[in-house]
Swiss-Prot record:
InterPro entries: Phage_holin_4_1. Keywords: Cell membrane, Membrane, Transmembrane, Transmembrane helix. It is found in: Cell membrane. GO terms for cellular component: plasma membrane. This is Uncharacterized 14.9 kDa protein in nagH 3'region. The keyword Membrane applies. Belongs to the bacteriophage holin family. Cp-1 holin subfamily. It comes from Clostridium perfringens. Signal peptide: none annotated. The chain crosses the membrane at residues 19-39, 58-78, 93-113. The keyword Membrane applies. It is a multi-pass membrane protein.
Length: 132
């Protein structure tokens, strides 16, 4: 039993190390983006359940979209590494872009579920939706 626990620990540490190597440092933009990706998917599933429109195809498209966000983030990381100036300029820029998009989607999902959204956020959503 102890061997199994050690293998699990080793696996978790290995995945964390691999993820850090691929995406760079565990900083606030990266953590925020990952949390927003999870929350957007979760609120989307809840919205689909409530509206009785939950579908595996839609869910798969959502997961694919989230995976492609990570691909774009990886491209930004590679550009930063290519520049070799010790900063995460492109990665941070891409992370902020997707944090904004995922945040808007989370708010839209919450509003569709009947969660009251502050008026200022509603106005910002309307302006951003008009620009799409």
């Amino acid at each position: 039993m102890e061997n199994i626990i050690n293998y699990i620990k080793w696996g978790i540490v290995s995945l964390g190390t691999l993820f850090t190597w691929i995406f760079g440092a565990w900083d606030i933009p990266l953590i925020t983006l990952l949390v927003f990706i999870f929350l957007d998917y979760l609120t989307g599933v809840i919205k689909g359940c409530k509206s009785k429109e939950l579908c595996s195809n839609i869910g798969l498209r959502g997961i694919t979209k989230k995976g492609l966000i990570l691909v774009v983030l990886l491209v930004a990381v590679m550009l930063d590494r290519l520049l070799d100036n010790g900063t995460w300029m492109f990665r941070t820029l891409i992370a902020y872009f997707y944090i904004m998009n995922e945040g808007i989607s989370i708010l839209e999902n919450c509003a569709a579920l009947g969660v009251p959204i502050p008026e200022k956020l509603k106005q910002a959503l309307k302006q951003l939706n008009n620009k799409k």
